[in-house]
Amino acid sequence: MKWHFGAKQVGAKQVDAKKVGARKVLSVVMATAVAMSPAMAGPALLFDAANGRVLYAEDQDDQWHPASLTKIITAYLVFEAVRDGKISLQDKIKVSELAHSQPPSHLGLPVGAEISVDAALQALIIKSANDAAVMLAEAVAGSQEAFVERMNAAAKRLGMTRSYFVNANGLPAPEQVSTARDLARLTIAVVRDFPNYTHYWAMEEMRLGKRVLRNHNPLLRSYDGTDGMKTGFICDSGYNLVASASRDGRKLVAVVLGETTGGNRSARAANLLEHGFQTQGWKTLFGAESLDTMPLAADAKSVVSIRQSVISWACGTGRRRAVARAKNRKRNVAAAAKSKAGQAAKKAPATTQ
């Protein structure tokens, strides 16, 4: 189901997926309502972070694999533990066997190595490090299992009624699900409850020893006003993103789930944000619908995998396409050689015996 409040053309162009990763800040204005683009894939939501007012919603209650967007609630619980004095940002935490066993994206530190809670939080958000998520979970709750119980309790407390978590980092698990609306509620809670930690979400890079780790969110380097939040990707979910941006005292947040490429993910989020910033008079045009008052979609779907649509070497589609291109090139070369041989035969002088 698609909700688009006060749809109105404001004159300019959409963000190009190929340009969204450029280092220069983009000055783009969106011409047509984002709702009109048939190529857009999964659920999406655009809302005001101050009051939860919805500017655009599409399939907002469909369950989706959150992938590394899971790390937003992981960070939320770590912030809570720091606030409550249970741990400090300066505390050293160790790499356990479980943390060390986590697949990329990860820091890859050896078992027994230590880093601060602060560094682990940076790695969680910037690098999207799966091992850092487990380290933090163990530091806060003693084990990942106990931490997951806290995640689900927090989700219930925050009104994330269609979300369920089984791990702290978002690695593939059939039962790990959320929705665009639930992730929006989580984002509002993070911004509201921990304004002193907003710098974590806005950091473009971090240093760990001699390594420089860059943020996976290209909008931080390409879209004017971007100040967070988090990317996510597994093959079954496609490319996910929660992106926040602030201009002229307004903070808008876009939730994008299930794009087939990273570029499309960034472009869709940028277009949604630009739509929100460029549409004038939105407070009166869009009515009073908010995350809490917008009705639950009657046709809300359970989670599905979009693996076959995702363009990524990790999911096999990139490899299959590369093989197909190689076969096409081989056929083209063979056809060209055959054609050249045929032309040469026609030009050859006739001979008699």
Which role fits each region the language model picked out?
Residues K2, A31-R181, I188-V191:
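Active-site-adjacent loops and short helices of periplasmic peptidoglycan-processing enzymes
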